[in-house]
Amino acid sequence: MSRLYYEVKISAENQEQANLILNSLLQKKLVTGGQFLKAPARFLWKGKITDMDYVTILSYTNDQHKDAVMDDVRKTTQEEVPMMTFTLPDDINKELRDWIDATLS
């Protein structure tokens, strides 16, 4: 059976939270690392439009670790609604697959 590889996006309300989340995942070897993408954000939250700066962690994992990533983020984040998405790329190059496997083993 082929392994599935995911591009992971995880939200954080600020850089401090993003660091805590990513460090926890890295210590457990659940993701390969991460880029921090900072941008202003706007949400409809509890009936009100809310503006804030947000950090998105962009990383990679595989199907073996997907559930553990979700569990760990839920334990680490301070967000009331943690936002995590796991996207299956249409294609992923061999070098990236090999690096993900080596990093997470």
Regions found by a protein language model. Name each.
Residues 1-105:
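Positively charged, small/polar-rich N-terminal and surface patches that mediate targeting and assembly
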